[in-house]
């Protein structure tokens, strides 16, 4: 087991502060678990653990997308706490995903609370828009955004630094069957996330590629999944150019003029 130092705790809080702004704006998508876990691992001095937890957590959250006011479990806290738990307690990445999910749900409800609370600012925002006061409108947006980012930082610091002793004690006290249950649940979550993604993106014409990838992984001995990813990228590029060439080969529809146009109105 490892101890998180005060400097590491503050660094993680600062990281999550920036990622919270990115999540609120959905600007650079740095809040995705694969990036959050990698950066967290770099701060903790174990990039390999960050990459492993990032890959698993990203798959688990691949199909979870906000829709309107509905918020899925928070990807930032999921990535952060999965890596922190795996590094500080020594459990494997699959178990860490299951243990990190409650922190993700906690942040999900905090974000939903902010969605409701910030409705109080709408009267002020409408007034600024009506008066074309762009400076005040900008300050209002920055105020709400910084409140959310600060909440991210405070919760991250409390969960990673102040609560690490209790977290390690909890992991030690868990019986083997419960730890194995979290490991099984964590192993299933990436499959569930990928299944949710396929519900949106899957098309019947791509079934051969799915079968080819499955056979490649199961029956061809490779040390890692990088060859499969490269093969998938090749298929994607092929489909892109193939679809583009088919689109260019289609004849362009020509508008027929069955009756003489009237230009009496000048148009």
UniProtKB/Swiss-Prot annotation:
PROSITE patterns: PTS_EIIC_TYPE_4. Pfam families: EII-Sor. Residues 1-10, 55-66, 116-141, 199-209 are periplasmic. GO terms for biological process: phosphoenolpyruvate-dependent sugar phosphotransferase system. The EIIC domain forms the PTS system translocation channel and contains the specific substrate-binding site. InterPro entries: GatZ_KbaZ_carbometab, PTS_IIC_man. Residues 32-33, 88-94, 163-177, 231-267 are cytoplasmic. Keywords: Cell inner membrane, Cell membrane, Membrane, Phosphotransferase system, Sugar transport, Transmembrane, Transmembrane helix, Transport. Residues 1-237 form the PTS EIIC type-4 domain. This is N-acetylgalactosamine permease IIC component 1. It is found in: Cell inner membrane. It is a multi-pass membrane protein. The gene is agaC. GO terms for cellular component: plasma membrane. It comes from the Bacteria. The phosphoenolpyruvate-dependent sugar phosphotransferase system (PTS), a major carbohydrate active -transport system, catalyzes the phosphorylation of incoming sugar substrates concomitant with their translocation across the cell membrane. This system is involved in N-acetylgalactosamine transport. The chain crosses the membrane at residues 11-31, 34-54, 67-87, 95-115, 142-162, 178-198, 210-230. Its main location: membrane.
């Amino acid at each position: 087991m490892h101890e998180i130092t005060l400097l590491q705790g503050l660094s993680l809080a600062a990281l999550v502060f920036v990622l919270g702004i990115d999540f609120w704006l959905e600007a650079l998508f740095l809040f995705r678990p694969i990036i959050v876990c990698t950066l967290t691992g770099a701060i903790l001095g174990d990039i390999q653990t960050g990459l492993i937890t990032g890959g698993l957590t990203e798959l688990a959250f691949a199909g979870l997308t906000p829709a309107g006011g509905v918020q899925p479990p928070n990807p930032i806290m999921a990535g952060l706490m999965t890596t922190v738990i795996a590094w500080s307690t020594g459990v494997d990445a699959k178990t860490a995903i299951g243990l990190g999910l409650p922190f993700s749900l906690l942040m999900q409800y905090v974000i939903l609370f902010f969605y409701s609370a910030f409705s109080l600012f709408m009267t002020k925002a409408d007034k600024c828009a009506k008066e074309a006061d762009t400076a005040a409108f900008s300050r209002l947006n920055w105020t709400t955004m910084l409140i959310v980012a600060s909440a991210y930082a405070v919760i991250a610091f409390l969960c990673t630094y102040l609560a690490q002793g209790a977290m390690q004690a909890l992991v030690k006290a868990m019986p083997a069957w419960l730890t194995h249950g979290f490991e099984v649940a964590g192993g299933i979550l990436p499959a569930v996330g990928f299944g949710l993604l396929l519900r949106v993106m899957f098309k019947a014409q791509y079934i051969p590629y799915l079968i080819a990838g499955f056979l490649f992984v199961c029956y061809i001995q490779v040390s890692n999944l990088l060859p499969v990813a490269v093969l998938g990228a090749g298929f994607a590029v092929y489909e892109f150019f193939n679809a583009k060439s088919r689109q260019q080969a289609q004849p362009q529809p020509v508008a027929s003029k069955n009756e003489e146009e009237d230009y009496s109105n000048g148009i």
